[in-house]
Amino acid sequence: MMIKIAVVLCAVMATTMVRAKYVEEQELADLLDLLISEEVSSPDDAVALQGWWRRTVDKVRNAGRKVAGFASKACGALGHSPQEARAKVLEAFPEMKEADLDEEDIGKYCGYAHALNGR
């Protein structure tokens, strides 16, 4: 069980370090060492671990919301339809080839951004 938790935390650590750069690496490494050595035996350690986990999840969630909000605003500025967005991007960047911009991809990314942002 502890190995599964350690693997999940490794994935969380990698995501957190990419998304929320203000999390200290040493804090993450200490937690992973604690899990691998199976020293989480006292109730105090478990409470500390739960508190750290909640803070980490909140930081990742907030970073994701910021990214989704930014992407949603950018899609809104470009236009709500994929055709409008594609036309505006090509207008802003004339050196870009039309084949590089697929309307389906633009629509899909804008749809994801709007869905994550709650619009």
Swiss-Prot record:
Disulfide bonds join C75-C110. The modification Asparagine amide is found at N117. GO terms for biological process: defense response to fungus; defense response to Gram-negative bacterium; defense response to Gram-positive bacterium; killing of cells of another organism. Residues 21-50, 81-104 form a propeptide. Residues 1-20 form the signal peptide. Keywords: Amidation, Antibiotic, Antimicrobial, Bromination, Disulfide bond, Fungicide, Signal. Heterodimer of a light and a heavy chain, probably disulfide-linked. This is Centrocin 1. It comes from Echinus esculentus.
